[in-house]
Amino acid sequence: MSVLTVEPGATPADEEPPDTGERHRLTAVTGLAALSLDAMASVAYGPEAIVLVLAAAGAHGLGFTLPVTLAIASLLAVLVASYRQVIAAFPDGGGSYAVAKTHLGAHTSLVAAASLVLDYVLNVAVAVTAGVAALTSAFPALYDDRLWLCLAVLGLITAVNLRGIVESAKAFIVPTVVFVGSIFVLIGVGLFRSAPVSTATADGHASVLAHNATTVGALLLLKAFASGCSALTGVEAIANAVPSFRVPRAKRAQHAEVALGAVLGLMLIGLSVLISRFHLQPVEGVTVLAQLADASLGHNWAFYVIQFATVILLALSANTSFGGLPVLLKLLARDNYLPHVFALKADRQVHRHGVLALAVVSAALLVFSGGDTNTLVPLFAIGVFVGFTIAQVGMVRHWRQERGRGWRGKALLNGFGALLTGVSTVVVTASKFEEGAWLVVVTLPLLVGAFVAVHRAYARIGERLGLGSIPDTPHRERSLVIVPVSSLSRLTSEALTAAASLGDEVRAVTVCYPDPEDRAQLHALERSWAEWDPGVPLVRLTCESRSLGRPIAAYVREVATSGPATQVTVLIPETEPERLWQRLLQNQRGAVVAHAVRRETDAVICRLRFRLL
């Protein structure tokens, strides 16, 4: 029974309604700004990927840039329509991972998770290299140092995320609006020009247009289509984050998804029209987007605005992976598919291990590619389209099982999308296999295998520990504490005092070697021990070799099995130096003993730290 308490002179209507947190969630506009960074940023490298492939057929091949882009825009429309259905069917979010886990089984969901992991990692590498490419297009003198610039940008983003940042959707609105607005201004102005107003950016750079041009065949067009499909990355981001929207969540997320598709499609088509109109050719060291800005707006302040807006948006796009991948790794760790360390948070509410893992792998990719975006883009497309295909196939099964009103049309739409994305996956894998796509083909099953292996290991550990069952009642056993000593000191006294409080019986042990010098030290220790008389026996362990840990471990095994049930504890006294550098002065004898006892016995190991203050 609840009781309503009202202050004198107040009415229930005067009370402030409870804060449900809705005001902190995303609207369609803020959701578009926060979750479309990957998709919007892809216009910086998607059209260029098409142009680079078609350049193999010379100027005639570049004439097919617009038709290929229209085909990609058509696929974008199918994907947007498909993901609207994913949002409606899975309002709790999760995207391809949630769809696969529900309708395609655990192993397929792991494939989706692995593709998401690759997507996040490659997004960082591609975004960083594309951002640096925009920077070097504006400042050509930096081109030879692009790899170091990439690593520096990655280091900065990593440092910021390790410190912990509070993400706000409103903070993403300004850079997103500036970038999208500048692209549309570029397109709008360019459509009214019959010729480039400036070619200063491309002057002095070598063209990569093929001199021995090949014919424009179906294979070349398919290859260009598959490469350009990298522009579709990020289309699934809104479906992954439906719970972040305000009520009605599904409807707002669907509106944001449609807006994303419309804006991205218009930008891709508009840029392709300008590429054809200005007869642009790919040149080394200058991005296609930089050439378009130069041709439409001139080599002035507007050109630099677009370049810096591109750099900032791509940096933010890379940053989204640092927010998304550690969370995905946390979920996989909670499901026992990754080491549990990935589920831990640092003092700043940061999944530090996930952030560091992402940074290390991304840095390796940057070194592998030499800081070149076009080397990484084909790898990016494979992981993305594997996730697309899994989501579409899962949705077909969803509609077949649900069989609601109009289910056949919905299943047909998702099936058509699965066919298109599946074909794109095969084409880009086959065409780019020798150029690096083999890395994804090998890594994807290895990741899935690693997930399964970790899961089995945790299952065995859980079975051994009896997780989920009531354990036996605790009982007391006879306890013996063994203390390794090599000399008499205050540390020895502190160790024996601690040992006496831990066990029923305490024994000190010392290892003796056959060398005359060592025997002399042993006799001196035994005389001092007898004179001190601590009430604890000193046991001599003879060892013919110079091993320290093995004789102690052998003695522990002997006393543990020779008498009644005994809980053996090995208490290892060690000093804790006052300063960090003084650790170099230690002989590490305690670590050697602990390692041997841990590896060869079931004894409890206790390491007593004596602070040297």
Task: Give the positions of each predicted feature.
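Cytosolic C-terminal regulatory domains/tails of membrane transporters and channels
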Residues: M1-E22, R460-L613
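C-terminal membrane-solvent junction of multi-pass transporters and transport-like membrane proteins
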Residues: L32, V341-R352, F388-F433, G468-P471
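Extracellular loop-to-transmembrane helix junctions
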Residues: I50-K101, H107-S115, V126-V153, G261-I269
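Loop-to-transmembrane helix boundary motifs in multi-pass membrane proteins
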Residues: A106, R146-L151, S244-M267, A333-V367, ...
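Membrane-interface loop-to-helix entry segments
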Residues: L154-F192, A256-L260, V377-I390, G409-L420, ...
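Helix-loop-helix junctions that connect adjacent transmembrane segments
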Residues: V177, G181-T233, S431, E435, ...
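Hydrophobic alpha-helical segments and their helix-loop junctions in multi-pass secondary transporters
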Residues: F179-H205, S272-H279, T389-G404, A453-G462
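Extracellular/periplasmic helix-exit of transmembrane alpha-helices
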Residues: G190-S198, Q254-A290
